[in-house]
Every structure is written in C-alpha cells, then in structure tokens.
C-alpha cells in the first residue's frame, strides 16, 4: 500500500529550524507546513517566532496566518488541515516539509492518534475540564489527571494546564488512557523525522538571546494586545511569550522580572519539547550549533530517504 513520504523537522524553540528548512526546501522541491500550534494565528507573530514576510515569500508555507486567536482551533483541526496541505503539496509533485516544535500536533499528523470524534461532544468535554481548572486551579487539575492516568501525568508539568486539559479531554473522548494512545497508533505517512539539538547550555543561551531579540522587535506591544483582550476567551492567553508579561501590565512586577520569567519559561519549554520528541517519535538527531555541515548532512539524509 502506497504511503506518502513527508519530511519532518523538529527541535526545541530557538534551535534554528526555520533557517534550516528555508535552506533545504528549494534543494528538495519542498513546501513547508508549520507544525507549530500558535503560528496559525494572524494576530501574534513575534512571540510565536512566525516566519517573516520575506521568508514566507521565499518558500510557500501552509498553516500560517490562517485563523484568528478568537477562533476555536484544536489538534483535530490541525490534523485535518495538515492532511489537506500534504495532499495539495504532493499533488504538485513537491515534498511536504513539516517544521515545528509542537510535538503532540506533529505526532498526531504523522501518526493516526485517536483524538476522539468532532462536534459538540468534543466542545462539552473541553468546557467541563476548563471549568474545573477555573474553579480549582492547575495543581488540582493535574492531580485529577494523576488519579486517572499516572503515567501520562508524570510526563506533564503540574503547571502546564494546557497539556493537562488536552490529556483529560482525550481520556474523556476516547474512554482510554492518554498514555495508551501510543500503543494504538499506526503511521499515516512514511516520515523521515530530523531533530535539531545541541548541548543544553548553548540551546539556553540561544533562547535568552532570542527573547532579547523579540523584545527589540516589539514583543511587549503584541503581549499588550493579548492582555487587553483577555476578557474574550482566546488561544494566546496561556501561550509562552504573552502571559509572562501580564504581571507587568497589572503593575505587580517590573519589566525586567517579566523578561527573565519569559526566558526561564522558554528554557523549561525547550526541555519539555525534547523530552516529548525523544519519548514519542523516532528521530534522526543533528547538531546545528556544533556541526557546520548540518545542512549538507540533513540533505543527504533526505535524499537517501526519498530514494528508498
């Protein structure tokens, strides 16, 4: 049975995925599908490290700037639109290149994870857990997951309410443990997954510099927009890069304190990304910071894969 080949480029935040993808795409006749859960939103660009207008012109991108943060958008929507993008790219005779850092979304696209049925049932389940979170807080929500599925809970930080909500939602929709999803998956595509990583200190230094660069590019203004619209339920409220500035806007903390908090949150997020990638996906790892030939090495891996 024919299985569509795709290339996936993953790695922690700030490692250089976009840069490498833009180098590789013309050489392998590829178009890029964003595998980032936040780049789909039109209103937030700096904090989501969205490709620039020039980069978007260089190579055709999919799942970037297609929704408003006030729209409902779930992993099921991402998979549906991602599959459509893969088909469109393949129909042209081009190679789909998925690039991003949202491990669960990428995994759900590459593999047939059981995500439950669409429709009102999905919405009502999400609302139920969201209400529980609002009434009891992130720690209690995580404890609830720990009771239902301790294996899944161990892989999620108690303060990461977004992932806890997702796990509880999947359990409710499917009637199966979130941690058992991996045992029930089958591949949707024949995927070569290339991962970028380097030693932790270098990755963390890049993250810190990247936050400074984002601040210079106008991140604070973008965060203020998110803060000013917090009364309307939207997707960016809990996103790293925005919520860290809320205490500054409310007068509780200094700007420097919030910038440092963002750097810390970004470093922790990078660590969680790597943990997910290493446990959930089969990856060919390359080091873009130590290896000057990383582009050539990635290209060789891709050519070998495509010629199989």
UniProtKB/Swiss-Prot annotation:
Residue numbers spanned by region Interaction with substrate tRNA: 36-39
Keyword vocabulary terms for this entry: ATP-binding, Magnesium, Nucleotide-binding, Transferase, tRNA processing
InterPro entries: Dimethylallyltransferase, Guanylate_kin-like_dom, IPT, P-loop_NTPase
Cofactor(s) recorded in Swiss-Prot or TrEMBL: Mg(2+)
EC primary class: transferase
Annotated Pfam families: IPPT
Leader peptide range in chain numbering: none
Catalytic activity: adenosine(37) in tRNA + dimethylallyl diphosphate = N(6)-dimethylallyladenosine(37) in tRNA + diphosphate
Swiss-Prot/TrEMBL site (Interaction with substrate tRNA) positions: 102
Similarity comment text for this entry: Belongs to the IPP transferase family.
Its job: Catalyzes the transfer of a dimethylallyl group onto the adenine at position 37 in tRNAs that read codons beginning with uridine, leading to the formation of N6-(dimethylallyl)adenosine (i(6)A).
Subunit relationships: Monomer.
Protein name: tRNA dimethylallyltransferase
Native organism: Lactobacillus gasseri (strain ATCC 33323 / DSM 20243 / BCRC 14619 / CIP 102991 / JCM 1131 / KCTC 3163 / NCIMB 11718 / NCTC 13722 / AM63)
Gene transcribed to yield this protein: miaA
